[in-house]
Amino acid sequence: MKRCLNKANMTTSVKIVNKSNNALPAYQTAQAAGMDLSAYITEAIVLQPLQRQLVPTGLFIELPEHTEAQIRPRSGLAFKHGITVLNSPGTIDADYRGEIKVLLVNLSNEAFTIQSGERIAQIVIAKVEHAHFVEVEELSDSLRAAAGFGSTGK
């Protein structure tokens, strides 16, 4: 059975203030999960090996209730240059109103220069469901039980 989805039902409106001179984040393809974030800096940042730096974007957002913004690495920066988001995914809660800043780290052996306008991370908007913990004396049995960290194969 083929399921038809109304595109209007798959979008979430997010209020944004752009204090940078960069374009607003946008999906690059119809099936993309994330939108690129760009650096908004007055001078280049040289990220030395193993150095970490908060990089401003000039963007401020107001998320709807029950959503979060996840800040994730860009695969090309990670693969080609060893630049990644240190606390990946970084979470922006719906009640945060400050500037979006990206915590980058250089995991390569070479210095990497970040210029203003350079795409440095992705932002993904996701639904959030709050959990209610129910304390019990023991948990039900499962096939996996307590096996973890590599227990399901190589």
UniProtKB/Swiss-Prot annotation:
CDD domains to which the protein is assigned, alphabetical: trimeric_dUTPase (cd07557)
Cofactor: Mg(2+)
EC numbers: 3.6.1.23
Reaction it catalyzes: dUTP + H2O = dUMP + diphosphate + H(+)
Keyword NAD in annotation: no
UniProt: substrate binding residues: 74-76, 87, 91-93, 101
Pathway assigned in UniProt: Pyrimidine metabolism; dUMP biosynthesis; dUMP from dCTP (dUTP route): step 2/2
Keywords from the named record: Hydrolase, Magnesium, Metal-binding, Nucleotide metabolism
Organism domain of life: Bacteria
Coiled-coil stretches noted in the UniProt entry, renumbered to this chain: none
Pfam families linked: dUTPase
Enzyme class: hydrolase
GO biological process: dUMP biosynthetic process; dUTP catabolic process
Gene3D superfamilies xrefs: 2.70.40.10
Gene Ontology molecular function: any one: dUTP diphosphatase activity
Protein family (similarity comment): Belongs to the dUTPase family.
Annotated PANTHER family: DEOXYURIDINE 5'-TRIPHOSPHATE NUCLEOTIDOHYDROLASE
NCBIfam families in the cross-refs: dut, PRK00601.1
Protein name: Deoxyuridine 5'-triphosphate nucleotidohydrolase
Organism: Cytophaga hutchinsonii (strain ATCC 33406 / DSM 1761 / CIP 103989 / NBRC 15051 / NCIMB 9469 / D465)
